[in-house]
Regions:
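Acidic active-site catalytic centers that drive phospho-/nucleotidyl reactions
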Residues: 7-9, 101, 119-122
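A generic structural signal for short hydrophobic patches within well-formed alpha-helices
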Residues: 11, 40-43, 123
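Active-site neighborhoods of divalent-metal-dependent phosphate/nucleic-acid chemistry enzymes
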Residues: 45-48, 71-116
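Residues at the C-termini of beta-strands that transition into short coil/loop
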Residues: 37-39, 77, 119, 135
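Acidic, PIN/NYN-like endoribonuclease modules and their adjacent C-terminal/linker elements
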Residues: 105, 109-137
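Residue-level recognition of specific faces of alpha-helices
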Residues: 24, 37, 82, 122-125
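Short, well-structured N-terminal submotif of metal-dependent ribonuclease cores
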Residues: 1-36, 48-64, 68, 137
Length: 137
């Protein structure tokens, strides 16, 4: 059975009910999908950065997402060695990756999850990562 780590951009589309992400999650099984605590932090930043008129609705959506994934939000504490290895490698080959993307990618690698992202190019230089784009035409 395939298991998946949903990148932040996929969660944003889920929260906005876009691109059939909710249906794709239902198809693979909600329990087969995980989030990184980095994604949660990025979503919280998005809420803090949103217009005051949208903030309460965004908080509700975030809270619902948190409940849905309550026991499937993965910590980064056990992926730090993989993060460091991947960061050194992408620096060595001259293909830098953003810090949060590195942590999310390392989480997918360590847990043996396929990373679902709209931005596959951001992760393609990580060794051993498996990627899927659920939004690609």
């Amino acid at each position: 059975m395939n298991t998946f780590l949903l990148d932040t951009n996929i969660c944003v589309h889920l929260l906005k009910n876009e691109y059939g992400i909710k249906e794709k999650i239902a198809k693979v099984g909600t329990t087969s999908c995980f989030l990184s605590e980095i994604t949660m932090a990025e979503l919280l930043f998005g809420i803090e950065n949103s217009a005051p008129t949208r903030r309460s609705e965004n908080i509700k959506r975030f809270d619902n997402l948190s409940l849905l994934f309550s026991n499937r939000i993965l910590s980064i504490s056990n992926v730090l060695h993989e993060y460091a290895k991947q960061k050194a490698n992408v620096r060595r080959i001259g293909k830098p990756v953003g810090e949060f993307d590195l942590l999310i990618g390392a989480t997918a690698i360590v847990h043996g999850l396929t990373l679902v992202t709209r931005n596959t190019k951001d992760f393609e230089n990580l060794e051993g990562i498996q990627l899927e784009n659920w939004i690609a035409p």
